[in-house]
Amino acid sequence: MPRRARARGGGGGGGEEVKVEDDFIDSVLNFGGGGGGEEDGDDGEEEQQQQQAAAAAMGKEFKSKNLEAERRRRGRLNGNIFALRAVVPKITKMSKEATLSDAIEHIKNLQNEVLELQRQLGDSPGEAWEKQCSASCSESFVPTENAHYQGQVELISLGSCKYNLKIFWTKRAGLFTKVLEALCSYKVQVLSLNTISFYGYAESFFTIEVKGEQDVVMVELRSLLSSIVEVPSI
């Protein structure tokens, strides 16, 4: 590669600076080869040609070291892309750019979820429980002001003298005691009992066992319980 003409000057210091600058430009142009850049390049090409000729003589394909390094780099890159696609739940396109974009979006969503969980943990346990309970109760049952609920009694036979008894009633003082007294008056044995209360109402679930003539007892017991839990007319 041709060298640049060096400036000739009278001052010794200025001449040194120009020489250093020219040497640096030559080294960049010749990729560090200095004055023998062309000779080194020719030697490299000649060596590569000799290697190609030797490989051809042996019936083998000549492989450049730079080419092999590039193939290894691309292999590692493709492996990382495949691993990224395996952990990102939503991939819009199969290109590398789209995979990286989808991964970034997924990371942002995860960061938002972490911030939301941290905010919820920052609330006091009482407030969090109150919000959750209020939301669930509002969705499950929202009574209206003009709604008029009558007492409901349901009996379902389970066989072997056993029944499921469900009673829906408005909570009034002493009402549950009257229900238990009615069951005892017919010698009904209570096997299990669960009660749910909400907004001034209650729903009780009994598993009972009846002795004696079941048909008569069930008809009379249903009538008695209905009269007990029925809402009195105003």
Swiss-Prot record:
Q: Which example biological process does GO assign this protein?
A: pollen development
Task: Quote the function comment for this protein.
Answer: Transcription factor that plays a crucial role in tapetum development. Required for male fertility and pollen differentiation within the developing anther. Plays a major role in maintaining tapetum development, starting in early meiosis. Required for pollen mother cell meiosis. May regulate the anther-specific cysteine protease CP1 and lipid-transfer proteins C4 and C6. Required for anther development. Functions in parallel with GAMYB to regulate early anther development. Functions upstream of the transcription factor TDR and may positively regulate its transcription.
Family statement drawn from the similarity comment of this UniProt entry: Belongs to the bHLH protein family.
In residue numbers, the region (Disordered) covers 1-51
Q: Name one Pfam family in it.
A: HLH
Keyword annotations from UniProtKB, A to Z: Developmental protein, Nucleus, Transcription, Transcription regulation
- Highest taxon of the source? Eukaryota
Entry GO terms, CC:
nucleus
Q: Write the signal peptide boundaries.
A: none
Q: Which SMART domains match?
A: HLH
Q: Where is this region: Basic motif?
A: 61-74
Domain bHLH span(s) in chain numbering: 61-110
Q: Where is this region: Helix-loop-helix motif?
A: 75-110
State one molecular function term (GO). Answer: protein dimerization activity
Gene ablation phenotype (knockout): Male sterility due to failure of tapetum to differentiate and pollen to mature.
Q: Where is the composition biased (Acidic residues)?
A: 37-48
Q: Where is this protein found?
A: Nucleus
Q: Which species is this record about?
A: Oryza sativa subsp. japonica (Rice)
Task: Quote the protein name from its UniProt record.
Answer: Transcription factor UDT1
